[in-house]
């Protein structure tokens, strides 16, 4: 076992119900000239407040479930996003033909790489010290089985094997 591995760390599952997962885009830098003539740089994130709210929801659940200091070893993540189906996918008798044809959610839930970026940033400082410790990740978007319209995101965190 590696010296950085936390021997007590086993797999942990986080379940976030309710808020729609938000994608975190890239940071953008805008140069500007200050009043004194020097050059400054303003950095913004794509997504803004909505991404902050989503990351806060992930952080709150992570703090409740992760009952130990941040690990210093490699970590693997799996993220499963259950997307509520639109009402147009249903008829009285169950799924409509359109609902049966659409096997996976498309753009509705966002890009998986940007969803993962938001989750990784939210877990920094709680689960691990730096999101560079994530050495393996899987993200899936699937249709929710129930009809209650609730977004559900499950995040599994486990130490990565050397």
Language-model segments: which ranges?
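Acidic, proline/glycine-enriched N-terminal capping motif
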Residues: 1-162
């Amino acid at each position: 076992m590696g010296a950085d591995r936390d021997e007590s760390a086993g797999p942990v599952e986080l379940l976030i119900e309710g808020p729609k997962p938000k994608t975190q885009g890239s940071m953008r830098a805008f140069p500007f000239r200050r009043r004194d003539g020097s050059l400054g740089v303003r950095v913004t994130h794509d997504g803004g407040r909505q991404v902050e709210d989503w990351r806060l929801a992930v952080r709150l659940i992570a703090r409740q479930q992760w009952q130990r200091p941040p690990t210093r070893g490699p970590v693997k993540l799996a993220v499963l996003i259950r997307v509520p189906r639109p009402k147009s996918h249903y008829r009285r008798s169950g799924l409509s033909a359109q609902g049966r044809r659409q096997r996976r959610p498309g753009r509705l839930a966002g890009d998986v790489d940007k969803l993962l970026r938001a989750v990784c940033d939210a877990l920094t400082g709680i689960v691990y010290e730096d999101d560079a410790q994530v050495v393996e990740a899987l993200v899936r978007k699937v249709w929710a089985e129930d009809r209650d319209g609730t977004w559900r995101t499950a995040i599994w965190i486990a130490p990565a094997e050397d």
